[in-house]
Amino acid sequence: MSGFNFEVITLFPKAFELINNLGVITKALDKNLIDVNLHDLREYGEGSYRQVDDKPYGGGAGMVLKPEPIFKAYESIRKLPKSKTLLMSPQGKVLKQEDFLRWSSLDQLIIICGQYEGFDERVRCLADEEVSMGDYVLSGGEIPAVSIINGLTRILPGTLGDPDSLIDESHNSYLLEYPHYTRPRVFKDMKVPDVLINGNHKEIELWRKEQMLNRTFQRRKDLIESQFSVQKHSDYDSNEWFWDI
């Protein structure tokens, strides 16, 4: 085992074949920067039919994942010293970029993917955190789990060819990223801004910061409001925060 360790408990391991076709993750796997192990819940199912779900007590629609297979799969995983267990759930805290930064200091993430109508409530005791992708419901936790593997992997040292590419990305500074342009200079009467052509790096930097602030204000004002709410309770100058982005 080498690099950052992901252990994923899932009923549909084939959903993770996607990671072998994602450039960033593939490179990290090839460099042994990460290790991804899948635990098929069906292998821990009960009886000759490998049952993993059952009808809910009290009635209701759908099927619920049984606790026994999930606990067996979880207990089969060798825990590393710095490890956290995530439960993918629409009831969880919405995933943010800062979560990737926080988890990157760990050695291991164990990710439990829900399915159907969810999982037996007793499974929650295994989790350190419950994580949601947003205020919507997917058919299972596999796609969110792939997103977590992708988002965390790309910030690990050695993954990206140019580490500086992370600096100005959307959400890394609580602002959305500035617009990007490449050749041709004019396309369908749409021109690249002159400031990006003139070679004045100070003007380019100022333009990019203005674009980040304007774009965030127009599209995600909540990010600015939350950041200034934090700064309001500290000695940090809000103008200094803007120039430090």
Curated annotation (Swiss-Prot):
Catalytic activity: guanosine(37) in tRNA + S-adenosyl-L-methionine = N(1)-methylguanosine(37) in tRNA + S-adenosyl-L-homocysteine + H(+)
One record GO biological process: tRNA N1-guanine methylation
Keywords: Cytoplasm, Methyltransferase, S-adenosyl-L-methionine, Transferase, tRNA processing
Pfam families, sorted: tRNA_m1G_MT
Record-listed E.C. numbers: 2.1.1.228
Subcellular location: Cytoplasm
GO terms, molecular function: tRNA (guanine(37)-N1)-methyltransferase activity
Gene3D superfamilies on file: 3.40.1280.10, tRNA(m1g37)methyltransferase, domain 2
Positions annotated to bind S-adenosyl-L-methionine: G114, M133, G134, D135, Y136, V137, L138
Record's GO cellular component terms: cytosol
Subunit note: Homodimer.
Function: Specifically methylates guanosine-37 in various tRNAs.
Sequence similarity: Belongs to the RNA methyltransferase TrmD family.
Name under which the protein is recorded: tRNA (guanine-N(1)-)-methyltransferase
Native organism: Prochlorococcus marinus (strain MIT 9215)
Taxonomic lineage: Bacteria, Bacillati, Cyanobacteriota, Cyanophyceae, Synechococcales
